[in-house]
From Swiss-Prot:
This is Mitochondrial fission 1 protein. Gene3D superfamilies: Tetratricopeptide repeat domain (1.25.40.10). The keyword Mitochondrion applies. Belongs to the FIS1 family. One of its GO terms (biological process) is mitochondrion organization. The keyword DNA-binding does not apply. The gene is Fis1. GO terms for cellular component: mitochondrial outer membrane; peroxisomal membrane. Coiled coil: none annotated.
Amino acid sequence: MEDLLNEVVPQEDLERFEKKYHHELELDGEVTTDTKFEYAFCLVRSRYTNDVRKGIMILEELARTHPDGRRDYIYYLAFGNARIKEYTSGLKYCRAFLDIESNDQVRSLEEYIKKEIDKEVAKGMVVAGGAALVLGGILGLGIAMARNKQKREK
């Protein structure tokens, strides 16, 4: 799953679908559902976080307004959120998908996200533990210095 999440869309594909998207927008003032999806699909696979976020926004709009493709939209919402390390949102979309139907690829993505959440929690605990040690050391040093000062004054 990690390999799939790290796979990046070729720049020429992204540019082609971006051009198609903007062409339809300029021509008709509206973009077809298929073109929106193709563009969003490329964006969530971009190497740039802002592109991924833009793809997520398009997919969210599609999921709200076009229930026919909701299954695909929800999967790529989970996928895009996992790519930008928005694991809580990614997990929410995985669960929403699995409520619709069982799918091994989505289960695999869900497991990957859960492992990444566990890693983040562990990192947070290490940082908190390190901060507590530093604070304890500073407090201990302060107490030792105060005692030393009291001894000198006597």
